[in-house]
Amino acid sequence: MAIRNFSGQRMNPGERTKALLQGQTVDRVGLFLFARGFCARNTGVSLMEFYTDPKANLEAQIWTAQMYGNDERLKFGFASSIAWDFGGEIKMPITEFDQTPMVVQYPVQSEEDGWKLEIPHVKEAGMVPLNMAFCRLQEKEGLVKTISIGAPFMNAANVCGLEKLLKWMYKKPDLAHHLLRLVTDYGIGLARYWMETFGPESIEFRTSTPTSSNQVISPKHFKEFSLPYLKELHEKVLAMGVGYFYTHICGDQNLNLPYYRDVPFGDPGIASFGHEVDLTKAIEFLGDKCIIVGNVEPRLILMGSPDEVYEASKECIEKGKKAERGFMLGPGCELPPTSPAGNVWAMRKAIDDFG
């Protein structure tokens, strides 16, 4: 089931995003819903099924994209999946209060575990077979294949736990760098597997940097422990022939923004930002390199009124339309699964009225 034109729109989501990436004029500001669990709840699919059944997952995302006119390229998975890939234990969402899969046991429990850790066989690791099945379904539907290869600092945190990684940065920096080396090489291998399977056309690779926010680490530690590995990952994957990266720069990363200038994203890439970063500042640092996405506060979408979401979306659009390489409106992080439909629609209405 392909994503058709939203009623009254000249372009469909695939055409609109492709035009942005090619530097062409689009008919309206794009909508980047950043929606996972919301798609499940929106279509009556359980979160357990959504995160374990690629077909049900894709259908839920397509129906939701059709409903709201979502221009985001659809993706399978969840933020901490690399813990599963490296042999950790994941708990799938099974109760009404669960929002997403979570790690219940990290692969690395001790320093000894860290030094003994090995890169898993990429084709068989954890969630990879499910992700590959999802991308094969995307291929059948004529959609761009998407795969999140994380970002090394986030992936290392999901291998040993963020608290341990932060402690080892100070007390055992060699061990921290060892884990970062392993997950970087794993991400490159995962990208190579996708490229060998599908070729460089119609693939979107994704990275995300929530654990690199200044709410977690300083700019000094970002420069030492996060930036070099993220830069290497992007450089080596782009050298394989893929066109661009989509990167979510999550949380308060205002002090890190100058360093992101050194990261290649493609020409252009796509970069989304947490609500803690003003879009004007995001455009200042990356607007010449990336299509900018953002950044309505997720809390507001979950707990605010439609009028409040509408006004916040209007403010984002007015700032974002000044981006040199283009702009898409979206939440500042994943759309909360229990967001009221009226609040999500308010974002789309703001695009219709101001974008």
Predicted regions and their residues:
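Intrinsic-disorder/low-complexity, polar/charged segments
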Residues: 53-55, 106-112, 125, 305
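A contiguous, low-structure linker/loop signature
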Residues: 79-120
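Active-site loop segments of alpha/beta catalytic cores
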Residues: 1-41, 45-50, 71-75, 94-96, ...
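Segments that shape or occlude catalytic/ligand-binding pockets
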Residues: 42-83
